[in-house]
């Protein structure tokens, strides 16, 4: 079987690595260069997008910001999974909010903003404090503002207005500020037959708006049930096929959906060592309509993002429960260069392993371990 992935970054890379044992060949479409490339080497392949579409059995995506005309070309083939509507909802907060409402899942109050009057109306609808997010293109904390007081309206509007005017169809979504206890996420999958599986919830720690540490949760049956039910509602609403990630706010034991990602997700990288079938293989299984299994937690596991670093002390390689995954990317400040998965026999032992790691790694570069 042959699969074409739209996007050629680290997620496509890891999906390709997970596909090989299944005897599934993967090629990728680099959205920037508009070339078909090998997902591991990035070497161009002498195929046009149209030729690649004809050659493969399945088309999928590694991220949601795919140009709509590319989605449309792939959709016409009947091979694209999940649906273009799912990808578009993941890339546009307005569509995402509408989806959550249609699926009847709990999320923060919101108001769409295109003009300053909309902004003022949002204050009445949503209230202060509020979080303001770009409808298109925002990620890792970018394109966001927090309104704490009416005195900030003019200065924040000036920045938002500039963003709205910077690209067609851009807007702002105002959301009620949610004072949450922690952020958690759920990775799940659904295939064409409607079979669904979910992984254990993950607790996430962000530093400067970027995911830094994810830990698989154990013994959270009530939260897990809430998350599973919301996953089912959203996946069914979309008639979803593939891996779907949902980020939640945990508010005193009640979950509210923050956002969705219609793809494999950074907070699910721990599944490479923590489960039998990682999220990357699970996505390939789902889009190829293969059985979904192996989602149970095998051992206590956490993932640490490597941000802006292209080397680590060799001492880490002496730790048998540590697994480094590099992405083969050029070093850049704050860039996701790779991740480390850490495993242990219990949550207590995992914390000891993370403490060992904290003593080895640079404390400024890995603040979440401090």
UniProtKB/Swiss-Prot annotation:
UniProt GO MF annotations: 5-(carboxyamino)imidazole ribonucleotide synthase activity; ATP binding; metal ion binding; phosphoribosylaminoimidazole carboxylase activity
Cellular compartments per GO CC: cytosol
Alphabetically ordered keywords of this record: ATP-binding, Ligase, Nucleotide-binding, Purine biosynthesis
Pathway membership, UniProt: Purine metabolism; IMP biosynthesis via de novo pathway; 5-amino-1-(5-phospho-D-ribosyl)imidazole-4-carboxylate from 5-amino-1-(5-phospho-D-ribosyl)imidazole (N5-CAIR route): step 1/2
Residues involved in ATP binding: 93, 133, 138-144, 175-178, 183, 206, 258-259
The keyword Signal is annotated on this UniProt entry: no
Chain ranges of the ATP-grasp domain: 97-288
HAMAP family (alphabetical): PurK (MF_01928)
The protein's assembly and partners: Homodimer.
The family this protein is said to belong to: Belongs to the PurK/PurT family.
Function: Catalyzes the ATP-dependent conversion of 5-aminoimidazole ribonucleotide (AIR) and HCO(3)(-) to N5-carboxyaminoimidazole ribonucleotide (N5-CAIR).
Protein name: N5-carboxyaminoimidazole ribonucleotide synthase
């Amino acid at each position: 079987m042959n699969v074409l992935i739209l996007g050629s970054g680290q997620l496509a890379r890891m999906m390709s690595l997970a596909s090989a044992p299944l005897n599934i060949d993967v090629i990728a479409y680099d959205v920037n260069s508009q070339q078909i490339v090998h997902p591991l080497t990035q070497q161009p392949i002498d195929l046009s997008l149209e030729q690649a579409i004809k050659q493969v059995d399945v088309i999928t995506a590694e991220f949601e910001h795919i140009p709509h005309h590319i989605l449309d070309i792939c959709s016409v083939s009947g091979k694209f999974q999940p649906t273009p509507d799912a990808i578009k909802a993941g890339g546009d907060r307005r569509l995402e909010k509408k989806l959550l409402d249609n699926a009847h899942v709990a999320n923060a109050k919101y108001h769409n903003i295109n003009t300053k009057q909309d902004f003022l109306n949002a204050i009445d609808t949503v209230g202060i404090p509020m979080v303001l997010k770009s409808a298109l293109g925002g990620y890792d904390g970018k394109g966001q503002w927090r309104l704490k007081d009416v005195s900030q309206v003019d200065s924040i509007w000036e920045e938002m207005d500039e963003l709205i005017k910077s690209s067609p169809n851009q807007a702002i979504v105002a959301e009620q500020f949610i004072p949450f206890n922690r952020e958690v996420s759920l990775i799940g999958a659904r295939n064409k037959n409607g079979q669904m599986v979910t992984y254990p919830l993950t607790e996430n720690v962000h530093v400067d708006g970027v995911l830094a540490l994810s830990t698989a949760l154990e013994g959270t049956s009530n939260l897990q049930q809430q998350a599973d039910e919301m996953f089912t509602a959203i996946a069914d609403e979309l008639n979803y096929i593939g891996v779907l990630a949902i980020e939640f706010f945990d508010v005193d034991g009640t979950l509210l959906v923050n956002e969705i990602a219609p793809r494999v997700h950074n907070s699910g990288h721990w599944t490479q060592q923590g489960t039998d079938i990682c999220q990357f293989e699970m996505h390939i299984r789902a889009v190829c309509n293969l059985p979904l299994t192996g989602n149970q937690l095998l051992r206590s596991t956490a993932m640490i993002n490597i941000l802006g670093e292209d080397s680590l002390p060799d001492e880490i390689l002496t730790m048998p429960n540590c697994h480094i995954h590099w992405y083969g990317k050029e070093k850049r400040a704050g860039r996701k260069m790779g991740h480390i998965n850490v495993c242990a026999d219990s949550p207590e032992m995992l914390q000891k392993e993370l403490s060992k790691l904290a003593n080895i790694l640079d404390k400024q570069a890995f603040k979440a371990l401090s």
